[in-house]
Amino acid sequence: MQPIYDWFREFYERTGINLTFIYDDFDRARVIKGFFLTLELSVVTIILSILVGIAGAWLQGSKLIWIRRIVAGFISFFRNTPPLVQIYFFYFGLGYLLPRLSDGAGGTVPMVSNLQWAIISLSLFAGAFNIEIFRSGIEAIPKSTMEAGTSLGLSRWQNYRFVILPMAIRVCLPALGNNLVNLVKTTNLAYAIAVPELLYVAKQIWGDSTNVREMMFFVLFAYLFLVFVLVAILHWIERRLAIPGFGQDAGKQMPQLSDVMVPVPSMPAAGGPAIARMLLLFVIMIGFGATVALAQTGTPKASAAEVLIRWMPLLLWGFAFNILISIAAMAVGTVAGVPVGIGQLSQWKVLRIGTRVATQLFRNSPWLVLLFLCVFLIPFEFRIFGLRIPFPDWAKAILGFSLPVMANTSELVRGAIRSIATGQWDGAQALGLSRWQTLRLVILPQSVKRMLPPWMNLYSLIAMSTVNASIVGVTEMITLTGQVHAAEGSRPELLAPLYAFALLCFFVYCYPIGKWTQALERRFQVKA
């Protein structure tokens, strides 16, 4: 292997392309360790999230209403708040409340490590989506199947374990696979709490070797490789476990919208009192964290409520900036994604392949990695005819978030157009309309209604993802939360209330979007 390492070292000297993670022993060891930690994080969170989904779906069928409400609250909380803030809340907030353990050398270590907190948080986040996925699979099982299990003397748990769950898994495998792929792409958020996964290691290497471009593209293609392998495995499992009459076999006669649309997860169904219960839960979280913290410190410092009231205008200003970033990213991404989606259906092979590749590339890339690419590779200013035009970090963040929006919007457009009955095209052709006229005057107006609900879901996900901009230094709500914490003397007892307030803001904003989306889905539902 040494000749290969020497060749890459000489390649760097000739071209300036510094692939230090290949020819340098120390960097290569760090990359390998980071990659396998990313792989471990992905595998463990996938397994735990599936277990959470299975347990939650079973509890949703409980006869006890308070259990069903707890599960509904759990789903609403984790699906309507940013996963990054959840990680911060668990690691910084709850982590401070737990006792520390002796390390045997006179020091102490946290009871739960940063890696363990990342696993817990990401597993619960993905598990909330899996609960709804398994529930939809269970609802697709004929009632006669459940009644047959009961008639054989099986208990409710036995019926669920041996009859319903195996069939439900086979029915919901496509949706489950999509969520697991999204989970793998989300694992890089562990970077924010210094888990030495692939992105964290890559940043250390480019800090030592100033090879930002090379390391960022390596991380991007490494995650694409993981996604490709996972998708291949899931497709193999799906083919092996396919049930005749469900999934693709059932939709061969006419393509259904759910078969061709991009898998943007929808928000959970919940009753009107759900939001009141969640608001009460957030108040309890803030109050509990503040009470325990004051009991531990025993000092008459400003309470968490006083700190929140004092700094609330600043924090809300930061939250408003998050919303502005999300709106701008959706606008830019949608404007770019519509023509790309139409291009995927073009009769020109080169255009069709090019737009398809671009869509899949940005759709399957981790959003945080795309954000890093835009922030670190785009210059901070441009010179045009001697005029310096600044390009601030917040503008780079908008561009970074607009790339996945473009890709997902492209898939929404392609899927919506394909779901229109072919008779619409034939009728327009009979009237003498050209292909472009048919698309503009007949197909796209019908497609808009079908695209709107998943497009709203996509916006909700983008709004929650804007907190990732805090990692690259954009001054938004989470960045200001850290500054408020520092201004209050970096008191660790304030972390749980501050991050709980951030979760509350996003929940209050995203939950109504989910309810509106459900209303749009019912209104624009495609009839079979």
Residue ranges of each PLM-predicted region?
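Transmembrane alpha-helices and adjacent helix-loop boundaries
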Residues: 1-528
